[in-house]
Amino acid sequence: MIPEELTLRLSGYTKPGQELFRNVLFDQLYASIPKDPQVKVQIYNAEIAPGGHTNWHCHNGATFFLALQGIFEAEFQEGMLVRAKAGDVYSEPIAKFHRGHNPHPDVPYLCIGFCLTSPDREHVTNAVTRPW
C-alpha cells in the first residue's frame, strides 16, 4: 500500500452541486520559454524505480514536471537543488547537468514531464558519467 501523502490526489474536489473544480498545481511567471516562432513540445510520463537514478543529463529548454507518486531529488554540481513529492510541480534549470533520484526504498517515483525546446536543439543531452 502506498502512503496517501506519496500519491497525487486526482479526484474528490467537487462539492455537491458543483460541476467543475480546477486544482491549480502551478501558476508562475516563467522567463525561459524559447522565443522561436515555433518550439518542439514533448510530453511524457516517467518512472524511477525505488532507490533508482536517472542518467546524468541536462535539459536544453524549459522543462516542467508534475509529480504523481513518490519522492524525487535532483543532484546538481551545487547539491540537491530540486526536491519534490506527489502533487508538486517543479522545473529543472536549463543546461545544468544533473541526475534524478528516487530515495524511497519501496515506492516508485512517477511523473509527467512537459518540455519546450527550440527547434534546432534536442530536448535532452545525456552524459555517460558525472560531467564535473
Per-range role (PLM):
Residues 94-122:
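Ligand-binding loop in jelly-roll beta-barrel domains
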Residues 39, 51-64:
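A short beta-loop-beta micro-motif enriched in histidine and acidic residues
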Residues 35-37, 58, 66, 103-108:
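Extracellular/periplasmic catalytic domains that process cell-envelope and extracellular macromolecules
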Residues 1-40, 127-132:
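A short, N-terminal "cap"/entry segment at the start of jelly-roll beta-barrel domains
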Residues 53-59, 76, 101-103:
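Short histidine-centered beta-strand/loop micro-motifs
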Residues 59-78:
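Glycine- and acidic-residue-biased ligand/ion/polar-headgroup-sensing regions
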Residues 48, 78-96:
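Short acidic-glycine-tyrosine-enriched beta hairpin
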